[in-house]
Amino acid sequence: MSTNPKPAFRRILLKLSGEALMGDEGFGIDPKVLDRMAQEVKELVELGIQVGVVIGGGNLFRGEGLAKAGMNRVVGDHMGMLATVMNGLAMRDALHRAYVNARLMSAIPLKGVCDDYNWAEAISLLKSGRVVIFAAGTGNPFCTTDSAACLRGIEIEAEVVLKGTKVDGVYSDDPMKNPEAVKYDELSYTEVLDKELKVMDLAAFTMARDHDMPILVFNMNKPGALRRVVMGEEEGTLIKAK
């Protein structure tokens, strides 16, 4: 295992699922998990890494069930966007309590709650060492927060999209259901598509591929994993062009 004294990345986009904030709870935000994540992000800032964050909203709102019951998909997606803003507010607060400067930018205007998304300002804030949290997805219905993560990652010229999940990488099958599942250390975009591996939704994944944006999948619930990832140590699964 190689340990580089310097970080492997200068600027990253960290994608966290809303579910990751739940901890062992079935719903909502576990304050202990939130504070631990804020501390891990703080470590990156102290290493001189510029950090953008996109958080999902699945811990607070899931639109699929309501859509099946007849709710308009656009309405459901708007509710989902607001859930990501709530998570973003919680993360910004946790970072501030950890003495980390952070700004929350929303793709839909919410005057008095958070800033409107502004590309030039986001870049400027990142360069000045502030963590920038991007909320409300892309601002459009029918787009996942994985799509938002890839889009924002490409826009801010991040070197990698780090996708924090509940498993420690990409497997040949669901490791929770199949103990024979094999973990991959590195994959090409083509291999992921050919093997039909579940990394993120197709629209998000092809956007990353088309713009040569590497994706690194790791377990955000594993203490220290995020730091190991940015230091270039063997952690998670890296997906990039071969």
From Swiss-Prot:
Q: Which pathway does it take part in? A: Pyrimidine metabolism; CTP biosynthesis via de novo pathway; UDP from UMP (UMPK route): step 1/1
InterPro entries reported in the protein's UniProt record: AceGlu_kinase-like_sf (IPR036393), Asp/Glu/Uridylate_kinase (IPR001048), Uridylate_kinase (IPR011817), Uridylate_kinase_bac (IPR015963)
| EC identifiers of the protein | 2.7.4.22
The GO terms this record gives for MF are: ATP binding; UMP kinase activity
* Free-text activity regulation comment from the record: Allosterically activated by GTP. Inhibited by UTP.
Gene3D superfamilies (alphabetical): Acetylglutamate kinase-like (3.40.1160.10)
- Pfam families listed in its UniProt record: AA_kinase
Give the region (Involved in allosteric activation by GTP) as residue ranges.
Answer: 23-28
> Subcellular location, in the record's words?
Cytoplasm
Q: Which GO terms describe its cellular component?
A: cytosol
What residues does ATP bind to? 15-18, 58, 62, 165, 171, 174
Q: Where is the signal peptide?
A: none
* UniProt xrefs under CDD domains: AAK_UMPK-PyrH-Ec
- Report the catalytic activity: UMP + ATP = UDP + ADP
Quaternary data: Homohexamer.
Q: What does this protein do?
A: Catalyzes the reversible phosphorylation of UMP to UDP.
Q: Which PANTHER family does the entry mention? A: URIDYLATE KINASE, URIDYLATE KINASE PUMPKIN, CHLOROPLASTIC
Regarding protein family, the annotation reads: Belongs to the UMP kinase family.
Its recorded name reads: Uridylate kinase
Q: Point out the gene that encodes the protein.
A: pyrH
